Amino acid sequence: MIFVKIFKKVKYSAILMHGEAVDEYEKLSGVRPKLSYLDKKPVLDVGYVSASHSGEYSVIAYSDKEVGVDVEKIRNVSFARYFMGEIGKPYSTERDFFREWTYRESRYKAYGISVNRATGRDIGLHPDFLLGYDLCVVGEGEILFSWSE
């Protein structure tokens, strides 16, 4: 199972977000996990954590398996100039560009590998409830969302 908590109007550095992840996990489970880093990737002694922030939102994902999360504010970019690595195709809208970007970022956070080295063990879930943003969660299992103002 993957638990995803979304915070509005909270801006953290990655290190502070990882500390917040420890606090949130303790609130959920009653157990205070120990946070460590493996190849610069945050790992809890009880599972995995991933964090991201953009614009007005911060997101933390927890799982007993590898997990990756990314949120990006959809903004005007010169996306016609951007090519996504080996895919080598321009995108027709900013939404398409950021959907691909967040999937690649989430996948890298979860497994440390690019989307082009597909394993078939995950999907990228893009819920549409954050207007003006793209959020992607990559991992295995059911995904539960929680919201905090």
Regions found by a protein language model. Give the residues of each.
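Core catalytic alpha/beta fold that binds nucleotide/phospho-ligands
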Residues: 1-149
